[in-house]
C-alpha cells in the first residue's frame, strides 16, 4: 500500500527538470542523425508524448515543471522576438513576399484544419450512431423476450 502512495506522489521539481532535460538531450541526439532538418524541441515533444502514452514517464514526473513553463510561455518567446528584430534587414528585402507567404500559409492551415475537423466529426458521429443502434437493438430484443 505504501508503494502505491509513493508511486502516485509527484516528483520533486529538480527531478522533473532532469527528466525534461534528458528528453531534450535525447531529442538533440536524434536530431543530429535525422536526414531531414527538424527542430530538436519538436522531436522532444513527440518523444515526451510517446513516453507519457507508454507509461515510461509518469505525468507526475513532469507536470509541475510543464505547468511552470506553460505559465511563463510569454517570457520564453522574448528571444524569438529579439531574433525577428535582428532579422529586420532580411525581412525588409522582400516584405510583400513574406506577407504573401504568411497569408497563403494561414489560409492553407485554416482549410486543412476544417477538413480534418469534418473528418473527425464524421468518424465520431458514426461510432456514436453505431453504439446507439446497438443499444436500441438490445432493448428491442429484451422487450420481445
Swiss-Prot record:
GO BP terms in the entry: cytolysis; killing of cells of another organism; programmed cell death
**Which GO cellular component terms are attached?**
plasma membrane
Top-level taxon in the UniProt lineage: Bacteria
Mention any Pfam family matching this sequence.
LrgA
Q: What are the record keywords, sorted?
A: Cell membrane, Cytolysis, Membrane, Transmembrane, Transmembrane helix
InterPro entries for this protein: Antiholin-like_LrgA, LrgA/CidA
Transmembrane feature ranges: 13-30, 40-62, 69-91, 95-117
Q: How does it sit in the membrane?
A: Multi-pass membrane protein
Q: Does the keyword Membrane apply?
A: yes
Location of this chain's protein in the cell: Cell membrane
Q: What does this protein do?
A: Inhibits the expression or activity of extracellular murein hydrolases by interacting, possibly with LrgB, with the holin-like proteins CidA and/or CidB. The LrgAB and CidAB proteins may affect the proton motive force of the membrane. May be involved in programmed cell death (PCD), possibly triggering PCD in response to antibiotics and environmental stresses.
- Tell me its family: Belongs to the CidA/LrgA family. LrgA subfamily.
Give the NCBIfam families listed for this entry: PRK04125.1
What name does UniProt use for this protein?
Answer: Antiholin-like protein LrgA
Record the organism: Staphylococcus aureus (strain MW2)
Gene, per the UniProt record: lrgA
Amino acid at each position: 500500500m505504501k508503494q502505491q502512495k509513493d508511486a502516485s506522489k509527484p516528483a520533486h521539481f529538480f527531478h522533473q527538470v532532469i527528466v525534461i532535460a534528458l528528453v531534450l538531450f535525447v531529442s538533440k541526439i536524434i536530431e543530429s542523425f535525422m536526414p531531414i532538418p527538424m527542430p530538436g524541441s519538436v522531436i522532444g515533444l513527440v518523444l515526451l508524448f510517446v513516453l507519457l502514452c507508454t507509461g515510461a514517464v509518469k505525468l507526475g514526473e513532469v507536470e509541475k515543471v510543464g505547468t511552470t513553463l506553460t505559465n511563463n510561455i510569454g517570457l520564453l518567446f522574448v528571444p524569438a522576438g529579439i531574433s525577428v528584430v535582428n532579422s529586420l534587414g532580411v525581412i525588409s528585402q522582400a516584405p510583400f513576399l513574406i506577407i504573401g507567404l504568411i497569408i497563403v500559409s494561414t489560409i492553407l492551415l485554416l482549410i486543412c484544419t476544417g477538413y480534418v475537423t469534418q473528418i473527425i466529426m464524421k468518424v465520431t458521429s458514426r461510432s456514436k450512431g453505431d453504439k446507439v443502434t446497438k443499444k436500441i437493438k438490445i432493448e428491442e430484443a429484451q422487450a420481445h423476450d
